[in-house]
């Protein structure tokens, strides 16, 4: 039997843009994606600390430093400047899950990784 576990998260990222006319997804700065072990087109859950919204979308690689942009319908669920948590999950065997540690990336208000 497999269980779903937290795989990684980007904690307290700041929304830098919201593009209603884009096809969909969340655009994330490539360096943040790498730090959080996120792949392009991977499904993620977005938790908006400002308004309590929780929704799912998928990742698109961003090019701008610190970029966190919600696209398409998801753009209606956030405001620029909102603080969000970007979460990914993974299914794994219970035995592996007992020893698994998720990747947690803490960022500042400019979406720079806190060392």
Curated annotation (Swiss-Prot):
Q: Any idea which UniProt keywords this protein has? A: Autocatalytic cleavage, Cytoplasm, Decarboxylase, Lyase, Pantothenate biosynthesis, Pyruvate, Schiff base, Zymogen
What EC identifiers does the entry list?
4.1.1.11
What is the gene name? panD
Q: What is this protein called?
A: Aspartate 1-decarboxylase
Q: Which domain of life is it from?
A: Bacteria
User: Localized where?
Assistant: Cytoplasm
According to UniProt, this protein's pathway is: Cofactor biosynthesis; (R)-pantothenate biosynthesis; beta-alanine from L-aspartate: step 1/1
Q: Name one GO cellular component term.
A: cytosol
Record carries keyword Lyase: yes
Q: How does it assemble?
A: Heterooctamer of four alpha and four beta subunits.
**Which Gene Ontology MF annotations are present?**
aspartate 1-decarboxylase activity
Q: Does the keyword NADP apply?
A: no
Q: Where is the active site?
A: 25 (schiff-base intermediate with substrate), 58 (proton donor)
Matches recorded under Gene3D superfamilies: 2.40.40.20
Tell me where it mainly resides.
cytoplasm
Annotated GO biological processes are:
alanine biosynthetic process; pantothenate biosynthetic process
Q: Which cofactor does it need?
A: pyruvate
